[in-house]
Amino acid sequence: WHDEINLPKTDLVVLPGGFSYGDYLRCGSMASKSKIMQSVTKFAESGGLVLGICNGFQILVESGLLPGVLLRNKYLEFICKNVHIKINKKENFYFKNIEKDIFEFHIAHNEGNYFCTEDQLKDIEDNNQIAIYYCDINGQTSDQFNPNGSIKNIAGVFNKKKNVLGMMPHPERMIDKSLSGEDGSLFFKNLIKNLK
C-alpha cells in the first residue's frame, strides 16, 4: 500500500486516524510525504472531497492542504474521552442538510492542539473555514470545554474551497448506542446522502 501512487476513481477520500508511521518526527509528517499524497493533493486541488479524521487531519495539515499545525496537547497528556462539538453548517458539503448542530464525538490524541498564526486565524475566520468547535452540551465554547488547548476551541477546519475537512474528533467511534452513542452515524449517513 505504501508504494501506491494513483487514486482509484472515487467520490471521497478519507484519511483515518491511526498513528501513521508510529507518529515519529511529528504526527502525520512522514505520512504526508508518502507517494499517494501527491495524488490526494491533485484530487483535492481539482475540487475532490477529502476528509481527514484525527491522524488524517494531522496529515492534511502537514501536507499543506489545510492551514495551521497540530501541536502537543496543552497539558502534554494523551486524551481519550467523549467531547461535545458544534459544527459550522454554512456553505459546505460535509454538514449540508444535517439535522443538528451539537454532537458528542470521541477524541483520542496526543497532538490535537490546533494552532495557527494571527494572519492565518484572520484568514480562516474571514473565509468561514472553522468547521468544528469544542463546546459544552449547549454549544457554548470556553476554555473549560477545550480539551487540548486549541486556539479558539477549534476541533476542525476546512480549506478555502471547503472540499477538504480535517477534524480531531472520531465520528466512527460513535455509531451505535451500545458503543456510547450514535452521533457519528448521523454524520456518516448525512455524508452518504450528500454524495448521492
What are these regions (language model features)?
Residues 78-81, 133-134:
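Central beta-strand plus flanking loop segment that forms part of the substrate or channel wall
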Residues 56-57, 91:
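Short, flexible active-site-adjacent loop segments at beta-strand->alpha-helix junctions, enriched
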Residues 91-160:
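Catalytic beta-strand/loop cores that center a nucleophilic Ser/Cys/Thr
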Residues 167-171:
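Glycine-rich phosphate-binding loops of nucleotide-dependent enzymes
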Residues 56, 84, 104:
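Conserved beta-strand and immediately adjacent loop positions that scaffold enzyme active sites
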Residues 84-86, 156:
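Residue-level detector of beta-strand face positions
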Residues 1-53, 59-79, 86, 122-125, ...:
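N-terminal beta1-alpha1 cap of cysteine-dependent amidohydrolase-like domains
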